[in-house]
């Protein structure tokens, strides 16, 4: 047996035809690397005082913008998949795949911030003056991303509500922003999808009515238990806690109270969409609700990671310029960025708060036989799928 490392053997293995010698598009041409890799314009170099870390600053922010573009690309495709009233399971799988891709990209963006932190505040000061009045506040793609997700103008902090003014000299940017403010956002489409959750029909399973009965029974049992408490202080404390719980549940069972909370910006979903989200959460172990529950988890992941990215950005800015200086674009810098960490910027805030309304597993309304069949998948029975259709 001949040695595989002999030169003749290696030569024969490597003797394939070199594709680069054929006519056609090469790697660099396909990726347009001549444009991408020549886009790092260092103003410190042009000013005859080159600052090494300016190159890192430019490359990192250009990478952010490329990833923002990919997230927007995925968001647009997801919104398109959600735009139809009838969503097949195969489409839901595609939505999950693309939402997960956005989550993975956002994790990468969060991890990019520490790379910028390898630059010291003094290093940044060496070229900061070249940036003014440029600012991350002027990132058109990030504003488009926020709008496409569902951040509404009224939920932005006061300074951020006038975010379009920085694009006044760019009619194309203003038009794109206007489009994203009027077209259905991902949050809008998810809300309509949740409103169609099977089992909410009052003349069907009527989950909401059954859930309300379960809560009333649970609170009555807890109240009876509290009344049997011998120690007055403990009894009063338990009764007070039950009264608070009753008020919390009233905020979801009374549509007017819920709508008032939406008007105040403390909730996002319509009353019926919130019902759908709670139902999916309770029955997530049922086969037909497995994918919808995963979808809700991914939406929260997206909100969480954007908040983490904002937080990391805030800490980095404080390290670089402190908490008193103005940002290069004229904002209050650190103070403004810190204000964006509030719940006002959480698009899917209601999903985070669903745990407030959970009840013990044994108190969850049992599914009827008909509903149990509707939420289960039959294997190899086309007639079953014809009868039950897809989830929403």
From Swiss-Prot:
Q: What enzyme category does the UniProt record give?
A: oxidoreductase
Query: Which residues hold substrate?
Result: 57-61, 128, 328
Residues the record lists as binding heme: 313
User: One matching Pfam family, short form?
Assistant: Trp_dioxygenase
Assembly mode: Homotetramer. Dimer of dimers.
Q: Which PANTHER family match?
A: TRYPTOPHAN 2,3-DIOXYGENASE
Q: What is this protein called?
A: Tryptophan 2,3-dioxygenase
In the record, what lineage is assigned to the organism producing the protein? Eukaryota, Metazoa, Ecdysozoa, Arthropoda, Hexapoda
């Amino acid at each position: 047996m001949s040695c595989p490392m002999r030169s003749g053997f290696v030569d024969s293995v490597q003797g394939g035809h070199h594709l680069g010698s054929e006519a056609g598009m090469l790697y660099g041409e396909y990726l347009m690397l001549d444009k991408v890799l020549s886009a790092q314009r260092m103003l410190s170099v042009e000013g005859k005082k080159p600052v090494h870390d300016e190159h890192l600053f430019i490359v990192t922010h250009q990478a952010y913008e490329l990833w923002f573009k990919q997230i927007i690309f995925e968001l647009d495709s997801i919104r398109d998949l959600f735009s139809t009233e009838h969503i097949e399971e195969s489409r839901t799988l595609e939505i999950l795949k693309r939402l997960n891709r956005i989550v993975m990209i956002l994790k990468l963006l969060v991890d990019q911030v520490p790379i910028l932190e390898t630059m010291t505040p003094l290093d940044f000061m060496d070229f900061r003056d070249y940036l003014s009045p440029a600012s991350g506040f002027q990132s058109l793609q990030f504003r488009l991303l926020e709008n496409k997700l569902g951040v509404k103008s009224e939920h932005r902090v006061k300074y951020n509500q006038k975010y379009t003014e920085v694009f006044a000299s760019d009619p194309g940017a203003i038009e794109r922003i206007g489009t994203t403010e009027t077209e259905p956002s991902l949050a809008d489409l998810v809300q309509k999808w949740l409103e169609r959750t099977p089992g909410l029909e009052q003349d069907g399973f009527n989950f909401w009515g059954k859930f309300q009965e379960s809560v009333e029974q649970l609170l009555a049992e807890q109240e009876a238990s509290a009344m049997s408490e011998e120690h007055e202080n403990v009894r009063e404390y338990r009764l007070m806690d039950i009264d608070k719980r009753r008020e919390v549940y009233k905020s979801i069972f009374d549509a007017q109270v819920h709508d008032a909370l939406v008007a105040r910006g403390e909730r996002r979903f319509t009353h019926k969409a919130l019902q759908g989200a709670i139902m999916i959460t309770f029955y997530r172990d049922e086969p037909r609700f497995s994918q919808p529950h995963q979808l809700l988890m991914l939406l929260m992941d997206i909100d969480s990671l954007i908040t983490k990215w904002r937080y990391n950005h805030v800490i980095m800015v404080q390290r670089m310029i402190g908490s008193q200086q103005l940002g290069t674009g004229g904002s209050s810098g650190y103070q403004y960025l810190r204000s964006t960490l509030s719940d006002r910027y959480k698009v899917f805030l209601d999903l985070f708060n669903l745990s407030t309304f959970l009840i013990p597993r044994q108190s969850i309304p049992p599914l009827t036989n008909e509903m149990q069949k509707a939420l289960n998948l039959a294997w190899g029975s086309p007639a079953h799928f014809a009868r039950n259709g897809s989830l929403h």
